[in-house]
Amino acid sequence: MTTTTHSTAAIMSLLDEAEWRQTQMDVGGLIQASALGKVALRYAVRKLMKRGARLRHDSGLYVCICDPSYEFLQMNLSKISWLERHCPPLDQELIMFGVIEAWEEASVRPTRQLVLFMTPKWDVFAYDSGILFFLAPSMAQFWHGAIVLEYWNALFPVEVRSHVRQHAHTMDDLVMVFHQLDYEKQVLEARRDKNTEGPRTFAKSVNSYVRAILESERRIREGKIPMTFVDRDSLRANSLAHIQATGAQPSHAPAQRVLSAPPSLPSPVSEEDPAAAATPPSSAATTPPSSVVPASVESELSSSPPLPPVVVKDVMYTAGEGDVVQMVVVV
């Protein structure tokens, strides 16, 4: 009985090693094809799709390599073309190379599906629930990076940008977010290795990036796809509905300052009022030159009662109506 158990374990180990080697070869072929261009990438994807290849990501997720002809794809070519035109700063073609799916027992179609795309400039995106998420600036970095679907790396369609402000306005902003997430991921992995091999270190302070990475790892360990918007505070703080509820000015409002009551100005001196002429001009002498106004305006100010101070709340700025995203967020 013991000999049979050891033999089975050895066979399983050999099969796992063979599967790992084949996965590495297939991933290397995809990386090489992506560097050669979109035609080579489409050919490599079609070849792996015929084999039914499912490649393991470093995070533990399995990527089903396929193109838009995949029978269980939950979007069509029209939707892909629409995303290419309505998710700035993306202005390139989206080349589909795989999906990450979640299935429930006896389900006819996937219960959840992440569709993976690559652009001719090697940027990798994931599509989920109407939003594109930037995952990596190249195919090689995608297979070793963190799968995080957060507000910072999201590209909202322009049709909903009057509900939520867009965080990244250029592709460089998205690449910067990727490097920040990758840095936090490497720090966490190095700390775990050090705790295993040597004396324990102090826990790292948990910021929004670390929280998103840890939640993504936890979901993957449970056999689930990482959820979107773990950091709800960032999303809520940039929701225009939340901003209007708190009394802030709309993002397109011009800059304003705190206004005070009008200054106390001397009454105009007329020739028919000699008593007023005899009054020493002490107030006029102490009035700064900036408060001297025309007589007509001065008479209106002196006859109207003083107004209370007007305090203007914080004002936010954007480049225009095209930079704001409207999306109804349920939290």
From Swiss-Prot:
> Does this entry carry the keyword Zinc?
no
Source taxon at top rank: Viruses
Picking any one GO biological process from the record gives: symbiont-mediated perturbation of host apoptosis
Q: What is its main location?
A: host cell
Compartments it resides in: Host cytoplasm; Host nucleus
> InterPro entries attached here?
US22-like
What keyword terms does UniProt attach to this protein?
A: Host cytoplasm, Host nucleus, Host-virus interaction, Modulation of host cell apoptosis by virus
Gene Ontology CC annotations of this record: host cell cytoplasm; host cell nucleus; viral tegument
Ranges of compositional bias, category Low complexity: 275-304
Q: Where is this region: Disordered?
A: 246-309
Q: Which family does it belong to?
A: Belongs to the beta-herpesvirinae UL38 protein family.
State the function annotated in the UniProt record: Plays a role in the inhibition of host apoptosis to facilitate efficient viral replication. Promotes stabilization and inactivation of host TP53 through interaction with host MDM2. Induces host mTORC1 activation by antagonizing the ability of host TSC1/2 to negatively regulate mTORC1. Thus, inhibits a growth regulatory pathway to facilitate viral replication. Prevents premature cell host cell death by blocking host ubiquitin-specific protease 24/USP24-mediated autophagic ferritin degradation in lysosomes thus maintaining lysosome integrity and cellular viability.
Complexes and interactors: Interacts with host MDM2; this interaction leads to the stabilization of host TP53. Interacts with host TSC2; this interaction prevents host cell stress responses. Interacts with host USP24.
Name of the protein in question? Apoptosis inhibitor UL38
